[in-house]
Amino acid sequence: MSGFFITATDTEVGKTVVAGAIAGVFRELGYNVGVYKPLQSGHVASNPEGDAARLKSLSGVPTQENEICPYSIEEPLAPRLAMKRAGRVVKLKEITDYYNGLLKEFNSLFVEGAGGLAVPYTEDALVIDFAKELQLPLIVVARPTLGTVNHTVLTIAYAKAHGLTVAGVILSGCKECEMERVQENKEMIEELSGVPVLGLLPFFAGEFTKEEVLESAKEHIMISKLEEFIQNESNVAGAPSM
């Protein structure tokens, strides 16, 4: 199995933008990368405002939104609760089997969870249980401001306690006027967790284009460090890029 599992310290911290942007950059580099978000609540997969649509747009993958996200619910709740209220049951094996099916099309997959690692996910699993099934290195997306050191260090400790590898942290939504504090938070996270902060992604105000996001990712995220993980797993694109 190859790729990354993108998780976060909380919801609405920029996880989807980070996942889509990194996938898009890797595809530009020639890697046969796909994106996968098994469960989505808050929007159905086809909604252009939803995460699946944003992942498709930023990454440039050929798969459709309902293939990127096979299980989606309109109600904005934790996925397990949203599915339960809608009378639907999704099990861990289903989303893991779907992942394995996507690997027939892509050499690597960037998988986005929902919220943080302890979120109730499928009927029988938390997000972290899914991450453990895949055994992909984690990218933790976090806020850059007050409270992020505690949340990020706890997330990393929880992941490590469950035997997961954390590739790095990306602080998302960094504003120029706050950069001194952001830099201090970055250094503290690295010191306390032993995990590198691989990027300080700027805050995107209003509407933004794919090109703007990908260029920002190239400038502000250490793509080469992430590339080492893919190469070490012998997953440089051997199939044609799509």
From Swiss-Prot:
Q: Where in the cell is it found?
A: Cytoplasm
> How is this protein annotated for GO cellular component?
cytosol
Q: Name one GO biological process term.
A: biotin biosynthetic process
Which keywords annotate this record?
ATP-binding, Biotin biosynthesis, Cytoplasm, Ligase, Magnesium, Metal-binding, Nucleotide-binding
Required cofactor names: Mg(2+)
Q: Which InterPro entries match?
A: DTB_synth_BioD, P-loop_NTPase
Residues annotated to bind ATP: 12-17, 51, 112-115
- GO MF entries: ATP binding; dethiobiotin synthase activity; magnesium ion binding
Q: Mainly resides where? A: cytoplasm
Q: Where does substrate bind?
A: 41
Question: What is the E.C. number?
Answer: 6.3.3.3
- Entry annotated with the keyword Nucleus: no
The residues that hold Mg(2+) are: 16, 51, 112
Q: Subunit structure, per the record?
A: Homodimer.
Q: Which PANTHER family match?
A: ATP-DEPENDENT DETHIOBIOTIN SYNTHETASE BIOD 2, DETHIOBIOTIN SYNTHETASE
Similarity-based family: Belongs to the dethiobiotin synthetase family.
List the protein's name. ATP-dependent dethiobiotin synthetase BioD
Organism, scientific name: Bacillus cereus (strain ATCC 14579 / DSM 31 / CCUG 7414 / JCM 2152 / NBRC 15305 / NCIMB 9373 / NCTC 2599 / NRRL B-3711)
